[in-house]
Amino acid sequence: MSAVPHATPSPTTIACLLGPTASGKTAAALALAARRPIEIVSVDSALVYRDMDIGTAKPSRDERASVPHHLIDIIDPADAYSAASFRADTLRLIGEIAARGRTPLLAGGTMLYYKALTQGLNDLPGADPDVRATLDAEAERDGWPALHARLAQVDPDTAARLAPNDSQRIQRALEVFMLSGQPMSVLLAAPRRTDDAAAAYRFVPVALEPSDRAVLHKRIAQRFDAMLDAGFIDEVERLRRREDLHPDLPSMRCVGYRQAWEFLDGDTDYRTMRDKGIFATRQLCKRQITWLRAMPERIVVDCIAPDSTARALDALERVLDGRTPG
């Protein structure tokens, strides 16, 4: 008598609410929380930082009290948080939330994190404080354009897509080369490293996208002005008073913070700071939408429709109830 093979369990469906800045993700997530026992896992590289509340449009205390939120306020602005850390933390949290009999909802707009979660990681070396300190010292002496020129010699493909003053990415690309001996462009082109941890899940993205980008741009300007009115400049000033923060840290390169830092340094006036902050947010939005449109499996909801929250709620419930293809 032949043995009966064990059936492979079907992967658990995980609803993911993705969208650019100012697309209404928080409203849709809270609407779902009013209907189901969910816990929200943030997919946002800015919300991880403590003491950065206004400029990141962090959910309010009341909103966070109404439904559990995860991966918010988990590290200090002086520290770094990687896509690999996000992947490990999120997979752990999904299991813990399910064990409590609740439903995880992934929500955010950092598409690099989502890609790392669903497609695996590249074999890039981790950050090395000593290498970074060396590169910082060289940049202080020679300037970032000089380091960009050095990068062009060892990794011309990466250098070609970076501006000569893009300190964070130039530093990372040189760091990768110094630690691995290989150009970052070569490592990124290699097959991604995967494991079985994510194979137990089927991630279904519900994408909030604008049918008219001009409407979203208007929202972005209104939101940036609201942040300024709420005390954003004071928030950045408090961070500046710390002796361990500087504008090249990942935290201070978040949209808005870098522009506010330049203003407080006296490099720009208030109007220019506002305009540059809004422009940078619009550019971020453009990149986020480009990432979303590269996901053929996504369920699209028009985020500027009058009933966009209701539409997003319906899409999320269909995903959770298994009423979607795939």
Swiss-Prot record:
<keyword id="KW-0460">Magnesium</keyword>
<feature type="region of interest" description="Interaction with substrate tRNA">
    <location>
        <begin position="168"/>
        <end position="172"/>
    </location>
</feature>
<dbReference type="GO" id="GO:0052381">
    <property type="term" value="F:tRNA dimethylallyltransferase activity"/>
</dbReference>
<feature type="region of interest" description="Interaction with substrate tRNA">
    <location>
        <begin position="44"/>
        <end position="47"/>
    </location>
</feature>
<dbReference type="InterPro" id="IPR039657">
    <property type="entry name" value="Dimethylallyltransferase"/>
</dbReference>
<feature type="region of interest" description="Interaction with substrate tRNA">
    <location>
        <begin position="253"/>
        <end position="258"/>
    </location>
</feature>
<comment type="similarity">
    <text>Belongs to the IPP transferase family.</text>
</comment>
<comment type="subunit">
    <text>Monomer.</text>
</comment>
<comment type="function">
    <text>Catalyzes the transfer of a dimethylallyl group onto the adenine at position 37 in tRNAs that read codons beginning with uridine, leading to the formation of N6-(dimethylallyl)adenosine (i(6)A).</text>
</comment>
<keyword id="KW-0808">Transferase</keyword>
<dbReference type="InterPro" id="IPR027417">
    <property type="entry name" value="P-loop_NTPase"/>
</dbReference>
<keyword id="KW-0547">Nucleotide-binding</keyword>
<dbReference type="Pfam" id="PF01715">
    <property type="entry name" value="IPPT"/>
</dbReference>
<feature type="region of interest" description="Interaction with substrate tRNA">
    <location>
        <begin position="286"/>
        <end position="293"/>
    </location>
</feature>
<feature type="binding site">
    <location>
        <begin position="21"/>
        <end position="26"/>
    </location>
    <ligand>
        <name>substrate</name>
    </ligand>
</feature>
<feature type="site" description="Interaction with substrate tRNA">
    <location>
        <position position="132"/>
    </location>
</feature>
<dbReference type="GO" id="GO:0005524">
    <property type="term" value="F:ATP binding"/>
</dbReference>
<keyword id="KW-0819">tRNA processing</keyword>
<dbReference type="GO" id="GO:0006400">
    <property type="term" value="P:tRNA modification"/>
</dbReference>
<feature type="binding site">
    <location>
        <begin position="19"/>
        <end position="26"/>
    </location>
    <ligand>
        <name>ATP</name>
    </ligand>
</feature>
<dbReference type="InterPro" id="IPR018022">
    <property type="entry name" value="IPT"/>
</dbReference>
<protein>
    <recommendedName>
        <fullName>tRNA dimethylallyltransferase</fullName>
        <ecNumber>2.5.1.75</ecNumber>
    </recommendedName>
</protein>
<feature type="site" description="Interaction with substrate tRNA">
    <location>
        <position position="110"/>
    </location>
</feature>
<keyword id="KW-0067">ATP-binding</keyword>
